[in-house]
Design a protein with these regions (language model features):
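Short, charged interaction patches at domain edges and termini
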Residues: 1-12, 52-67, 103-145
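Hydrophobic alpha-helical membrane-association signature
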Residues: 2, 87-91
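A common structural junction motif
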Residues: 92-102
Length: 145
């Protein structure tokens, strides 16, 4: 069930990795999936999608409310302010006010929970800018499910 939530959201942003956008999309949401190195990355811009508020240690909702509210963190990275802004524009058009498809669940459109302007990461030796958009995901059992 939780994998379906993660997969439903990722299905909205993974097409950004294909042409013409060609922006790599990474996630460490389940099973310790790989994240990109933050230094020396071969691509000039990329995004990392993570989740919070979902029980991610297994597939079941046992012990959790049938109504799920989670947060989707989309971290944008680029070598310039403009690249990060471009990445935010692309991911926002893919996620904002869109309903992920999750089998057996009634899903509300994704809402912007908070947003951050691109800013330089001063801890990195190479130029790196970053910004985080946070979306709220709310699902409930589908009627008749």
């Amino acid at each position: 069930m939780i994998r379906a939530h993660v997969a439903g959201v990722l299905a909205l942003v993974t097409p950004l990795a294909a042409a013409p956008t060609s922006m790599p999309v990474y996630s460490s949401a389940l099973d310790g999936a790989e994240q990109p190195p933050l230094t020396g990355h071969p691509d000039s811009r990329w995004v990392v999608v993570d989740f919070d508020g979902l029980p991610q240690d297994n597939d079941r909702l046992a012990g959790w409310s049938a109504n799920i509210t989670g947060l989707v963190y989309v971290r944008h990275f680029g070598q310039t302010f403009a690249e990060v802004g471009w990445a935010q524009e692309k991911t926002r058009s893919a996620l904002l006010d869109v309903r992920p498809v999750i089998a057996g669940r009634s899903v509300q459109p994704l809402r912007m929970y908070s947003a951050q302007r691109p800013s330089p990461d001063r801890d990195e030796p190479t130029p790196l800018f970053a910004a985080v958009d946070v979306y709220q995901l709310f699902t409930a059992p589908a009627v008749g499910a």
